[in-house]
A protein has these predicted regions:
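Tubulin/FtsZ superfamily GTPase core signature
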Residues: 1-209
């Protein structure tokens, strides 16, 4: 995770990503981009971004404009929005590191992110009684102002409590991927956690957008 537009993040992030990739790591970068009203910082960020993207398997652009828009929609302080970014990354790490009923691993992620085009991380959380609201939150969650319509690849993990049913998984997955390319490669996982009772969480890596 880095903030572009200043000195340290802009100067070091691309090199750190390059070194990590040299060691065989799967490199997932999340880059915060400055407001449009900050032309100098925007210029610095634009110069740094190509190096970071070239050395990352997935590079998620986080627009401060989009973050502020999300906050207005949710009627929250926009600075609290940084917590959403952490939730995105935490959700992905949990997906890959935890044992589930249907497991996902790094090979699954590599299969998805190797699709041509951009990629993004998506997360949505809500009540298990209203799975459609989870999908709606997930579709509105990207912080880099992209659309998942026509996406070519999707790795999706559904997390829930012991009350999660097969119908929850089917409804969430089918609804979420309905706007993607008909030939979209979809890899699905599922995980049960006692902490998620009464709730559902959808975590997805969407590529080829």
């Amino acid at each position: 995770m880095t903030g572009l537009g200043g000195g340290m993040g802009s100067g070091a992030s691309g090199e750190l990503a390059r070194m990590a990739k040299q060691f065989g790591c799967l490199v997932l970068s999340v880059a915060g981009l400055p407001f449009a009203e900050q032309p100098l910082r925007c210029s610095i960020a634009e110069e740094a971004l190509p190096s970071l993207e070239a050395n990352s398997d997935v590079c998620i652009r986080v627009s401060m404009e989009r973050l502020a828009w999300q906050s207005r929609r949710r009627k929250t302080n926009w600075m609290i929005g940084s917590g959403w970014i952490g939730e995105l990354v935490e959700g992905l790490v949990t997906t890959l590191a935890s044992v589930g009923r249907i497991n996902l691993d790094l090979m699954d992620m590599k299969a998805i992110i190797n699709k041509n085009g951009n990629a993004t991380l998506i997360v949505g959380t809500g009540s298990s009684e209203n799975p459609s609201s989870v999908v709606e939150m997930a579709r509105n969650s990207p912080l880099n102002d992209v659309t998942i319509e026509g996406a070519k690849g999707c790795m999706i993990q559904v997390e829930g409590g012991p009350d999660m049913t097969l119908s929850h998984l089917t409804e969430l997955t089918d609804t979420f991927v309905s706007q993607m390319d008909p030939d979209c490669q979809v890899i699905m996982g599922a995980r049960v956690s006692d902490e998620m009772i009464g709730k559902l969480r959808l975590v997805a890596v969407v590529s080829g957008i």
